UniProtKB/Swiss-Prot annotation:
GO molecular function, one term: small ribosomal subunit rRNA binding
Subunit and interaction comment: Part of the 30S ribosomal subunit. Forms a tight heterodimer with protein bS6.
Name of the protein: Small ribosomal subunit protein bS18
Matching SUPFAM superfamilies: Ribosomal protein S18 (SSF46911)
Any Pfam family: Ribosomal_S18
GO cellular component, one term: cytosolic small ribosomal subunit
InterPro entries reported for this sequence: Ribosomal_bS18, Ribosomal_bS18_CS, Ribosomal_bS18_sf
Keyword Ribosomal protein: yes
Function (record text): Binds as a heterodimer with protein bS6 to the central domain of the 16S rRNA, where it helps stabilize the platform of the 30S subunit.
Gene (name only): rpsR
Length: 85
């Protein structure tokens, strides 16, 4: 059985030269969350260690402030708050 190889991904925060991640900016955080609102690992997002840690802190703050749900039922996965308006 062969191992699945992931393509090289680059940290979008480093490339965009972002200096601060705000927990209220859900559009920026949604790229690091799965459809069930779990934090995706670095190997899938391509974030560097520094930015992955900062994103995790911002997501945890957003969850604490009730901007992002902690857990999601399978029935509620269809209704995403990140829909484009």
């Amino acid at each position: 059985m062969e191992r699945k190889r992931y393509s090289k991904r680059y940290c979008k925060y480093t490339e965009a030269k972002i200096s601060f991640i705000d927990y209220k900016d859900l559009d920026m955080l949604k790229h690091t969350l799965s459809e069930r609102y779990k934090i995706m690992p670095r190997r899938l997002t391509g974030n560097s260690k520094k930015w992955q840690e900062r994103v995790e802190v911002a997501i945890k703050r957003a969850r604490h402030m009730a901007l992002i749900p902690y857990i999601v039922d399978r029935k509620r996965v269809v209704d995403s708050p990140f829909k484009q308006h």
